[in-house]
């Protein structure tokens, strides 16, 4: 029986623990301050998430019991309050079409300025500047994004290097083939020139031989003719009669 009673007490205590907290003023000052800090941070976080996820213009103003101001705005608190005042006045006095267009363009311009400011802040964070406004979780996310970006950059660089190496290898093979082709053409041309030189040399030798033999024969014929024209001293001396003195 005692065991069953203890189990019932434990179950009832668990149900009470899982129950909703009664919303009322916390009398204990310390507990109230701790709860204020927790709820304030949660509210600021929710306001930030709402502005980012839904692209909403959010302004949050909190005063503690001691009069300390806490605020958050994705644009500016003053600008959002002025927009709120104008929206309230427009509800009483509906704007004209021109005023509505002006308000629309002003909102678009404000949105673009906000986007530009966010991009500029992100660029500064990527460069390692203005990091004092980031908490540990945001710094961790920034580090992860930078590591992923560096990994993609290195992968792209490696891909380009591999492509460049492959191109250079193909180019080297093409140049080697061109070099071999040129060498073969030079060798072929050199062989033809040598053959032409040999033929020309042989023809020159042949012509010089024929000319020499012809000149030698001509010389012999001339020599024979000259000999024929010269008198034969022996025969002339024999045929002439001896002179007689009277």
Swiss-Prot record:
A Gene Ontology BP annotation from the UniProt entry: carpel development
Keywords, sorted A to Z: Developmental protein, DNA-binding, Flowering, Growth regulation, Nucleus, Transcription, Transcription regulation
Disulfide bridge partners, by residue number: none
MADS-box domain segment(s): 18-72
Predominant location: nucleus
Keyword presence, ATP-binding: no
Alphabetical list of Gene3D superfamilies matching this protein: Transcription factor, MADS-box (3.40.1810.10)
One matching Pfam family: K-box
K-box domain: residues covered: 102-192
Record's subcellular location: Nucleus
MF-aspect GO terms: DNA-binding transcription factor activity; protein dimerization activity; RNA polymerase II transcription regulatory region sequence-specific DNA binding; transcription cis-regulatory region binding
Keyword Transcription regulation in annotation: yes
Stored PANTHER family: SERUM RESPONSE FACTOR HOMOLOG
Protein's name according to its UniProt entry: Agamous-like MADS-box protein AGL5
Organism, as annotated: Arabidopsis thaliana (Mouse-ear cress)
Lineage: Eukaryota, Viridiplantae, Streptophyta, Embryophyta, Tracheophyta
């Amino acid at each position: 029986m005692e065991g069953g009673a203890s189990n019932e007490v434990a179950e009832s205590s668990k149900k009470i623990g899982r129950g909703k907290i009664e919303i009322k003023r916390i009398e204990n000052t310390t507990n109230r301050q701790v709860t204020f800090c927790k709820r304030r941070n949660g509210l600021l976080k929710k306001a930030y998430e709402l502005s980012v996820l839904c692209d909403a213009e959010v302004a949050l103003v909190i005063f503690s019991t001691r009069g300390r101001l806490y605020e958050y705005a994705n644009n500016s608190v003053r600008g959002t309050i002025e927009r709120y005042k104008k929206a309230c006045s427009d509800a009483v006095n509906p704007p004209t079409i021109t005023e509505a267009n002006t308000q629309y363009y002003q909102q678009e311009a404000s949105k673009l300025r906000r986007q530009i400011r966010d991009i500029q802040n992100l660029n500064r964070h990527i460069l390692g500047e203005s990091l004092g406004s980031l908490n540990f979780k945001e710094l961790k996310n920034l580090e992860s994004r930078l590591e992923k970006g560096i990994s993609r950059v290195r992968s792209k660089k490696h891909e380009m290097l591999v492509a460049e190496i492959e191109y250079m290898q193909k180019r080297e093979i093409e140049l080697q083939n061109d070099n071999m082709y040129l060498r073969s053409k030079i060798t072929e041309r050199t062989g033809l020139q040598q053959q032409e030189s040999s033929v020309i040399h042989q023809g020159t030798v042949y012509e010089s031989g024929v000319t020499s033999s012809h000149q030698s024969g001509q010389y012999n014929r001339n020599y024979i003719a000259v000999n024929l024209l010269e008198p034969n001293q022996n025969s002339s001396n024999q045929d002439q009669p001896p002179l007689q003195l009277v």
